[in-house]
Amino acid sequence: MDYQLTLNWPDFIERYWQKRPVVLKRGISNFIDPISPDELAGLAMENEVDSRLVSHQDGKWQVSHGPFESYDHLGENNWSLLVQAVNNWHEPTAALMRPFRALPDWRMDDLMISFSVPGGGVGPHLDQYDVFIIQGTGRRRWRVGEKVPMKQHCPHP
């Protein structure tokens, strides 16, 4: 797949890159998911692959790290599966990195892909690095904005 950005790259760099958050709807023309949820879940069962499950119930968040043996216990709501460096393990996903090669290599890390059921997510947080989020299959409510004071929560010392 040849993914094409719909944005004007020089304008994006000048106006937004490392300056402020922005949502660009339909930022990739004719987007097709390069990996299915089942394939992603399969990767998260491999020892070499960095993955985690984030779930919440009654305001309590919990994270567990892969590899995972089963997903049967999770139910149909309030959890997300996140898999790091998918581009290193699944060749078709590597094509998603190509449109961003205008950035220097040292700015590019990996392609993390997540799958969420209704109510799933990772909760409000600040990333300490620049992130491009590409919404694939499904629906999601994204909220982005300027940095605001947040209470630090470290459930896993």
Region locations from a protein language model:
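Active-site region of the double-stranded beta-helix
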Residues: 1-15, 28-35, 41-157
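Glycine-rich, often proline-containing surface loops adjacent to acidic residues and nearby aromatics
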Residues: 19-20
